[in-house]
Design a protein with these regions (language model features):
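A charged, aromatic-enriched C-terminal amphipathic alpha-helix characteristic of glycosyltransferases
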Residues: 44, 188, 334, 351-383
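Nucleotide-sugar-dependent
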Residues: 221, 271-276, 285-304, 314-323
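Conserved donor-binding/catalytic core segment of Leloir-type glycosyltransferases
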Residues: 4-6, 167, 203-231, 241
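Donor nucleotide-sugar binding/catalytic pocket of nucleotide-sugar-dependent glycosyltransferases
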Residues: 33, 144, 157-198
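Nucleotide-activated donor-binding/catalytic signature segment of Leloir-type glycosyltransferases, i.e.
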Residues: 250-277, 282
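Conserved acidic donor-binding segment of nucleotide-sugar-dependent glycosyltransferases
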Residues: 328-337, 345-351
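Membrane-proximal helix-turn-helix segments that form the acceptor-binding/catalytic region
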Residues: 34-39, 99-106, 119-122, 126-131, ...
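N-terminal subdomain of nucleotide-sugar transferases
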Residues: 1-63, 165, 228-234, 317
Length: 385
């Protein structure tokens, strides 16, 4: 089977080169999501990536840059030109993606797109439909529940509606979007199979104990409650480390200046984040569950957390299958007071108990939910008649 994966992305090598020293790293979550899925697909199919580099005018110094074709993770990356002028860039992305996809298609090809990369997805989808080949739409968020104009939401919904197959995060997402009952597969996420090469060890843990969060640093994601709850818990020999961008950063930096137990580390490359996760005692996801969008989501950070072998504390996300529950500590009360109480309880456990919990979670996601296994489910869906 031949997969043409059309998306806003680049190889990990190019991403490191472009953004390694940049304070704000664009599309860092989607970059890892797609890279892992591409590498997983490449274990069972030939993969060509029609890649629109995730660059903007602040990074791109030249008016026009054409990155060379390259191989990484078993896939071939074929780049759309990077152009500073936004109008010319949109045109180049649309036209370039369409023709690159069109000319790559063969009898055993299937096209995969990110339904939220509107121009890229539309262009690749049209090429697939023109050649009579399947087009798989990956949907990681509902357009109707994202910010942006009504036009941008309708545009994304149009692209998603005209795909022939789907990858959804949750069954609720399928019920909402897939009214025509087209073939679909639920992939709540995928862990990085190469994490098996890492060797977590209790003696490598930092002291004082570190409660750790990496991701969107915004009130919407429960960061204020996490910080307030941690400070109220006042657990001896423990610190809270937070990484990522968001609207809560300014207030968080002010708190970190006055409270030495709280540390804000800005944005780091993903490998640096993973290294710090291995050193932490507890990884926390405080995302509130009352918002409507939450039942349609599964934070990719959950997979990364669990694969690290460090114990995880998370809210009871409705999009998280119950098979995950035995492997994590669950936060049922999401208020600052509830977080404080739960942190006191969890951090009263011994290092050995917490480490054992984390290692069981690691075994679960690396053996049953890694990117190779999850990608194979997409290939199996495409093989079914």
């Amino acid at each position: 089977m031949h997969i043409i994966y059309a998306v806003t992305t680049c190889s990990d090598r190019v991403y490191q080169q472009l953004f390694g020293d940049v304070k704000v790293k664009p599309a860092f979550q989607s970059q890892k999501y797609h890279r892992l899925l591409i590498e997983g697909l490449a274990k069972g199919a030939k993969v060509d990536v029609v890649a629109n580099p995730p660059v903007n005018r602040s990074v791109l110094q030249k008016n026009f840059v054409q990155l060379p074709r390259e191989e990484e993770g078993g896939a071939c990356y074929r780049y759309i030109p990077a152009i500073r002028n936004p109008i010319l860039k949109a045109a180049a992305v649309g036209i370039g993606t369409f023709f690159k996809t069109l000319f790559l298609i063969r009898k055993d090809s299937a096209v995969i797109v990110d339904g939220l990369n509107r121009v890229t997805a539309l262009s690749a989808m049209l090429a697939a439909r023109l050649r009579g080949r399947p087009c798989v739409g990956i949907v990681t968020d509902l357009p109707d529940m994202l910010g942006g104009s009504r036009f941008s939401k309708e545009f994304a919904n149009f692209v998603i509606r005209h795909c022939t197959h789907y990858v959804f995060l949750t069954e609720a997402m399928n019920d909402y979007l897939n009214k025509a009952r087209k073939p679909y597969v639920i992939l709540e996420g995928h862990s990085d199979v190469t994490m098996k090469e890492k060797h977590p060890a209790l003696e490598k843990k930092s002291h004082p104990r570190i409660c750790f969060y990496a991701g969107g640093v915004s009130r919407q994601y429960g960061l204020k409650n996490l910080v307030d709850g941690f400070r109220a818990a006042d657990v001896e020999n423990a610190a809270l480390h937070i990484y990522g961008p968001g609207d809560y950063v300014e207030e968080l930096e002010a708190i970190a200046k006055e409270d030495p137990r709280v540390f804000y580390g800005g944005m780091l490359m993903n490998q640096e984040i993973v290294d710090r996760e291995l050193e932490a005692t507890l990884l926390v996801n405080p995302r509130p569950t009352e918002e409507e969008y939450v039942k349609y989501s599964f934070p990719s950070k959950t997979m990364e957390y669990m694969a690290s072998g460090t114990a995880v504390l998370t809210t009871v996300l409705p999009g998280m299958p119950k098979e995950y529950h035995p492997y994590v500590y669950l936060l049922s009360d999401e208020t600052a007071e509830g977080i404080a109480k739960t942190l006191k309880t969890v951090l009263s456990l011994s290092d050995e108990v917490l480490f054992d919990k984390g290692m069981k979670a690691r075994a679960f996601v690396l053996e049953q939910k890694n990117n190779v296994i999850q990608a194979q489910k997409i290939l199996e869906m495409l093989k079914r008649k």
